[in-house]
């Protein structure tokens, strides 16, 4: 399959969305607060998401209000909006 085909692009989007949900669920399962390095390790081991895509994912979480990020401690905290997102069916 051509990686630029509409089908391939759609599969990539679906994969990334599954990864996003899984990373948020992992954050929730760990008490709702984790250091960014722990989230990065999880996403890399489970989904092979490297640094740049992980950064895009985290920026999306913060911009959507699903996660708050503390630059001083490098901790990500799941918000109420993040919990509501996880409560919705995938």
Question: Which sequence ranges carry the predicted segments?
Answer:
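A composition-biased, non-transmembrane "mature-region" signal
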Residues: 35-36, 56-58, 73
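Short acidic, hydrophobic short linear motifs in intrinsically disordered regions
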Residues: 33-43
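Minor-groove-contacting beta-hairpin "wing" of winged helix-turn-helix DNA-binding domains
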Residues: 74-80
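Short alpha-helical segments that sit at the start of domains
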Residues: 1-26
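Short, amphipathic alpha-helical interaction segments positioned at domain boundaries
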Residues: 83-90
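Short amphipathic alpha-helical elements of helix-turn-helix/winged-helix folds
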Residues: 22-30, 42, 85
């Amino acid at each position: 399959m051509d990686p630029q085909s509409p089908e391939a692009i759609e599969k990539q989007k679906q994969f990334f969305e599954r990864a996003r949900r899984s990373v948020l669920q992992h954050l929730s399962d760990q008490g709702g607060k984790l250091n960014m390095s722990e989230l990065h390790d999880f996403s890399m081991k489970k989904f092979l998401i490297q640094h740049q895509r992980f950064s895009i994912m985290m920026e999306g979480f913060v911009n959507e209000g699903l996660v708050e990020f503390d630059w001083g401690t490098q901790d990500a905290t799941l918000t109420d909006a993040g919990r509501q997102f996880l409560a919705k069916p995938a």
